[in-house]
Amino acid sequence: MKQKLLLSGLAVSTVGITSYLLKDPSNRQKAREFIHSMKMKITKQPDMETFPVDKAGHPDPQDIEDNKMVSEGSMYPVQYYDEKKK
């Protein structure tokens, strides 16, 4: 009961403060701009012009670090399979 009364009191006071602050047209315009900018930040589309992967597809065979990473990565399934068989 107390929680319900507290929540309704909080809602009424929030509506009252908001309506008091938004009765001035300049404050309304500021609020609209703020809401619009926040909406644009939240729904911002990723930049499709740049691709996030630098090295994709066919790697250079002379790239030692890349080749080492590929060879080390392929051992995990083999070790997992060996442990399951034992």
Curated annotation (Swiss-Prot):
Organism: Bacillus subtilis (strain 168)
Gene that encodes it: ybyB
Chain spans, region Disordered: 46-69
Biased composition (Basic and acidic residues): 55-69
Signal peptide location: 1-31
Protein name: Uncharacterized protein YbyB
Keyword Signal part of the UniProt annotation: yes
Keywords recorded for this protein, A-Z: Signal
